[in-house]
């Protein structure tokens, strides 16, 4: 028998989440963001469930090629563009749309020998200060690209740094408008947060990521609780040991939890080597036999401890939901001082994954 931990992926939830994105951005087309191996869910496992998308957006050539080999014939957007000039041969072969954000990429495109022009997403730095041209350079760069035989359709893109806030995109939108002055261009601006909360930024293409997988771009589940979005991933395990503590006894490495009274705890087959956050403190929510309770003590490599006071019926073999439909990944992440994105992406290879 295998160790009882597993991650299950609800593909119907994934389909529903894409449908909700379309309802939120009715006039825009959708790039479904599947970077980081579909946020830890596995591109090969999930892509066909959202095959009704208009396009896929990601980073790695290997993942783009996987989509082509699995039969996806629609658009693929490479969000960070090509990393080396020689990559353009592969972009040409697989008909990939590339982001352009740096001067050297302009030169590489100019000098490349392509069989057909590539579609381009010109990135403007609207305040995130990661990638992209400054707004006052965009018109010049646009004209340079437009004059190249290797360039096909062009779209202006940017990425919001604070779209989870009600007034969080106003400054960025002003910079984008400055960049787009004098251009008649398609635009792709909205990440997950802007897709949900800033319809004025939808334009031609939205780029939802985390919301497709049923977690909140703000890191707070309550912000999306009424949207109909559903968690796709459930991480579950079982109790493999039970201890009855006396008052004053401590639990785990460093003895960071001390029982105030006699207390039963369950030892769960899950730890930080599985992707559960090591920094999750005592009190992190967990579901035992359908009853909400909490972790106690320090998370170990392969195990963690939970309070069985609310569920005295629990024992060896009792099911445990670490995150999923009832215990939201955002809540676990918040307790651990991180975000749901990180927990999804950190799911360890040793954890078996099933689709339902």
UniProtKB/Swiss-Prot annotation:
Its EC number is 5.1.1.1. PROSITE patterns: ALANINE_RACEMASE. The active site is at residues 35, 253. Signal peptide: none annotated. This is Alanine racemase, catabolic. Keywords: Isomerase, Pyridoxal phosphate. GO terms for cellular component: cytosol. The modification N6-(pyridoxal phosphate)lysine is found at residue 35. One of its GO terms (biological process) is D-alanine biosynthetic process. It comes from the Bacteria. One of its GO terms (molecular function) is pyridoxal phosphate binding. Substrate binds at residues 130, 301. It comes from Escherichia coli (strain K12). HAMAP family: Ala_racemase. Belongs to the alanine racemase family. SUPFAM superfamilies: Alanine racemase C-terminal domain-like, PLP-binding barrel.
